[in-house]
Amino acid sequence: MSKEKTPRSLGDNEAKAVARMLRVSPQKLNLVAQLIRGKKVDKALADLEFSRKRIAYDVKKTLESAIANAENNHSLDVDDLIVAEAFVGKAMVMKRFSPRARGRSGRIEKPFAHLTIVVREVTAVAAGA
């Protein structure tokens, strides 16, 4: 017997995309995630396009993936999508050593982060209310 399928954790009007192991600290990634949270997807894509942060490119790719998931997998209207959630999680931290003076060593930490973006379709009635 196969394992029972877990119920869908998102609503019928939602879709999500996840980017894992992004080579950036969660604090820096969260700055870009805050930039798009709650906005319409076309405005969020424009903001990411002109952001000067290095990680904005990866966030934009993840948002485009969430939009494609909404359109192709869940048949949602792209024009009515907003970024419902954009949250960041901590991943592993690579530890490296840097040689220092007089035979000592310094520790360098290279953090990684996960990014989850959830887009939601809102109707004109719900947006106006």
Swiss-Prot record:
Q: Which InterPro entries match?
A: Ribosomal_uL22, Ribosomal_uL22_bac/chlpt-type, Ribosomal_uL22_bac/org-type, Ribosomal_uL22_CS, Ribosomal_uL22_sf
Source taxon at top rank:
Bacteria
One of the protein's GO biological processes: translation
GO cellular component terms, A-Z: cytosolic large ribosomal subunit
Task: List keywords of the entry alphabetically.
Answer: Ribonucleoprotein, Ribosomal protein, RNA-binding, rRNA-binding
CDD domains in alphabetical order: Ribosomal_L22 (cd00336)
SUPFAM superfamilies named in the record: Ribosomal protein L22
Instruction: Indicate the quaternary assembly.
Output: Part of the 50S ribosomal subunit.
HAMAP family to which the protein is assigned, alphabetical: Ribosomal_uL22_B
Report what the protein is called: Large ribosomal subunit protein uL22
Supply the source organism's classification: Bacteria, Pseudomonadati, Pseudomonadota, Alphaproteobacteria, Hyphomicrobiales
What gene does the UniProt entry assign to this protein? rplV
